[in-house]
From Swiss-Prot:
Stored Gene3D superfamilies: 3.30.300.20, Ribosomal protein S3, C-terminal domain
InterPro entries recorded: KH_dom, KH_dom-like_a/b, KH_dom_type_2, KH_sf_prok-type, Ribosomal_S3_C_sf, Ribosomal_uS3_arc, Ribosomal_uS3_C, Ribosomal_uS3_euk/arc
Source organism of this protein record: Methanothrix thermoacetophila (strain DSM 6194 / JCM 14653 / NBRC 101360 / PT)
Biased amino acid composition, Basic and acidic residues: 228-240, 258-276
SUPFAM superfamilies on file: Prokaryotic type KH domain (KH-domain type II), Ribosomal protein S3 C-terminal domain
The protein's name in its UniProt record: Small ribosomal subunit protein uS3
Domain annotation KH type-2: ranges: 17-86
Gene Ontology CC terms: cytosolic small ribosomal subunit
Gene Ontology BP terms: translation
């Protein structure tokens, strides 16, 4: 078999297995499956809202599914692993099945669509689109869309980011298709950008030596000014002090003058005696 035909056959088998599991696990809240081929066989991971209903009592239902997959689709040693879908309101397959079930139970399509859209957005989805098509209220078919948030419709982001689910509601007037597309929270979109604050520079510790050197000239100037002020104050104090004058007698002579004259006369007398 050519390589191209082999890939086509594998894709066709995968689609048939997905359709079979969706039909068998409708009541368990089927949320999709992932099939991988390994050297030990075919590994199938089933996501469901109620994993206990997939396994069954004592593993009875999961063994039945394993036998049917091996016999009907000729899978090599199929091994089924059941996982919980997590937040069911963010799984497009689960939301589409709920919407189809609501329409089958008689809900008005606008009420059902708006209710599901609000639940999905309240769960934290970045965007959601619900498309309901078929005979909604009259004999003619029409399409109604309910949109909220951000949705990619084309390109690689639409294939990798957007989760798509489809379900059919069967009513008396005919079949109604329900398509749900959800952008989960945390999805990285190609046109997203983020502004980050610049990194903070580490605070530098002040250098003590420079501060000391800068402080020395100012201290020297203050010392000189203080010394000059002290000298000036001493000079002013000396100038302001009054000059003391000796007391005078009635004749206008100081009391020491007579003593000095007496000493002079005694010296003259002594000199005359020596001359003789």
């Amino acid at each position: 078999m050519a390589v191209e035909k082999k890939f086509v056959q594998e894709g066709f088998t995968k689609a048939l297995v997905d359709e079979y599991l969706a039909k068998e696990l409708d009541r368990a809240g089927y949320g999709g499956m992932v099939m991988n081929r390994t050297p030990m066989g075919t590994q199938i991971t089933v996501y469901a809202e109620k994993p206990g209903m997939v396994i069954g009592k004592g593993g009875k239902l999961i063994r039945k599914l394993t036998r049917d997959l091996e016999r009907r689709f000729r899978l090599d040693n199929p091994q089924i692993d059941v996982q919980d879908v997590g937040k069911s309101d963010l799984n497009a397959r689960v939301v589409a099945n709920r919407l189809a079930s609501s329409l089958e139970h008689g809900w008005y399509f606008r009420k059902a669509g708006q209710s599901m859209l609000r639940r999905v957005m309240d769960s934290g989805a970045l965007g959601c689109e619900i498309v309901i098509s078929g005979k909604l209220t009259g004999p003619r078919s029409r399409v109604e869309k309910f949109l909220a948030g951000y949705i990619k419709h084309s390109g690689k982001p639409a294939e990798e980011i957007v989760d798509t689910g489809y379900a059919v509601a069967v009513k008396k007037l005919g079949a109604i298709g329900c398509q749900v597309r959800i952008v989960p929270p945390g999805a990285v979109l190609p046109d997203d950008f983020q502004i980050n604050a610049p990194p903070k520079e580490p605070e530098k510790e002040p250098v003590v030596e420079e501060a000391v050197l800068e402080a020395e000239p100012s201290q020297a100037a203050e010392t000189q000014e203080q010394q000059a002020g002290e000298k000036k104050s001493e000079l002013d104090r000396l100038l302001d002090e009054p000059v003391e004058t000796p007391p005078t007698t009635e004749e206008g002579q100081s009391p020491q003058e007579p003593e000095s004259r007496t000493e002079m006369s005694e010296a003259e007398t002594h000199g005359d005696i020596q001359d003789r």
